[in-house]
C-alpha cells in the first residue's frame, strides 16, 4: 500500500487495524507513506503496525526543510495491491475529510479497481 496522506483519524485508525489484523494472520503487509503528506501520522500508530509485523517506510523524510529541495519532491501515489490480482488506485487519501466533503473545498477524488494482468 502506498499513500501520500494517512491521517491519525477514524479512517486512518480503521485502516491501520485492518493492516495489523492481516499482518498478525500471516499476510505480508507493506505500507509506504509520504513523510510530508502524512506528517500527522503518529509514531504510536506506526509502532503498533510495526509491532504487528506491518513493514512501514516513509518516502523522502525531510530533516531540515529549509536546507533541501527534497521538501517538494513528494510521492502523491495512492495505490493498494491486495493479492497480486486486485489493485486500487486513484486520488483518494486515507483521511476522514475525504468523506466529509467541504473540508478543503468542493472536490471529488476517485479510485478505481484494477484486476488481472495489469496488477502483476
What kind of region is each of these model predictions?
Residues 2-120:
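HKD-type phospholipase D/PLD-like phosphodiesterase module
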Amino acid at each position: 500500500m502506498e499513500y501520500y496522506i494517512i491521517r491519525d483519524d477514524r479512517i486512518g485508525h480503521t485502516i491501520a487495524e485492518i493492516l495489523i489484523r492481516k499482518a498478525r494472520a500471516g499476510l505480508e503487509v507493506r505500507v509506504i507513506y509520504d513523510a510530508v503528506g502524512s506528517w500527522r501520522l503518529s509514531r504510536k500508530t506506526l509502532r503498533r503496525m510495526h509491532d504487528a509485523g506491518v513493514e512501514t517506510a516513509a518516502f523522502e523524510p525531510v530533516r531540515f526543510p529549509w536546507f533541501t529541495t527534497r521538501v517538494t519532491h513528494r510521492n502523491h501515489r495512492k495505490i493498494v495491491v491486495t493479492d497480486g490480482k486486485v489493485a486500487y488506485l486513484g486520488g483518494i487519501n486515507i483521511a476522514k475529510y475525504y468523506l466529509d466533503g467541504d473540508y478543503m473545498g468542493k472536490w471529488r477524488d476517485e479510485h478505481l479497481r484494477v484486476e488481472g494482468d495489469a496488477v502483476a
